[in-house]
Amino acid sequence: MLRLRFFLVTLGLLVLWASPASAELLALLNYESKPGQPVRREGIAIMEIDPESADFGKILMDIPLPSDLVAHHIFFNRDKSKAYITSLGKSVLLAIDLTRFPYRLRTIDVPDCQVNEDLVVSEDNKTWFLTCMGSSNVVMGDAQTDRPIKTISASDAAAFILYPHGIAIHNGIDRVLVTSTVKPDMSDQGDTVTVLEAKTGKVLSTHQVASKPTPAKSAPVEVMFSPNSNPPVVHITNMLEDTLWAGIWDPKSKAFTFAQVDDFGAKEQGMPLEMLYNKEGDRLFVTTAKTGFVNLYDNSEPRQPKFIKAIASAPGAHHSVLSPDERYLFVQNSFLNLEGMSDGSITVIDLKNDKVLGNIDTLKSAGYNPNCIMLLPNHFQNSGLRANVHLH
């Protein structure tokens, strides 16, 4: 059983009650040792990332993880009362009840899922879908009990699931989309997106998302629905083709059409990965791991986002989060511990002036790479975390 352990002496953890006026901007960062370290370690750090805080860059809490878990991404359910951590190394999900403190890790067995990647939760907060890149299937689960309820696989030429990674859901049109990315050992690459029926998990159709004929090996990696778009529009990052695509929903035919909307290769960038939208949905941010940029788009027309500018981050630019007031963008710079794409820092960008304020090197300096960054929801309005945790 995985247990949450607090090293009160060695880590110097101290929890204090703070006044409501004590503003905090806390991030969850799962991390792992950089290559070549004598002892491999994984964990989840809770870090203060507010540039105006006296605790900026400090780790307030550290939650150790098994060193062979290979924790990958962090996802929330719809009300952000629960966090899920996917694992590349084991057929398990980890869950944290964010409304209970101290935080406790709970293991969810998903035996049909190998190399679990991304997770989405239905809009009614009752069902989750988990992509399994190693076993080429998708697992549906009960989001209340966190028990798997259905394993979805398909091999028909017109509707199949192969190396699924990215996933997006829109219950308004009863659709789930999953990308076909790469075989975990990188010996094969996909070039398609598959559409599922959200209520049943029925596999409906598969569509090529690439500028060349199959096998294009474009490796679509992430797919997201653009907020507030009517008709619904998805955006897709093609990791190995270095392009951004859009899928537009047709209410009459109840089908998507797909088209390329930007080319990162022309910008001398490679490996587009994650996407992020602001609250209004009129801004889109796309990271590229080579050589490390975040691209800003005017997303007023989601069917054709307009490129505004690229801001240099660091090699391995991957996940990003916005501060609640959308003044700051934080970019986590590490991609699978890969050489040349694992800087290990967190870049802080001032969006008011479109400039880099600096980097948080806390994990990097200790010999670790962050794998994901998410803002920690505040379910304790009158409390705060204060600590000075040193990683060894």
Identify the role of each PLM range.
Residues 12, 22-392:
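Predominantly soluble domains enriched in secretory-pathway, periplasmic, or organellar proteins
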Residues 14-16:
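Hydrophobic alpha-helical segments of integral membrane proteins
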Residues 18-20:
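N-terminal signal peptide c-region/cleavage motif recognized by signal peptidases
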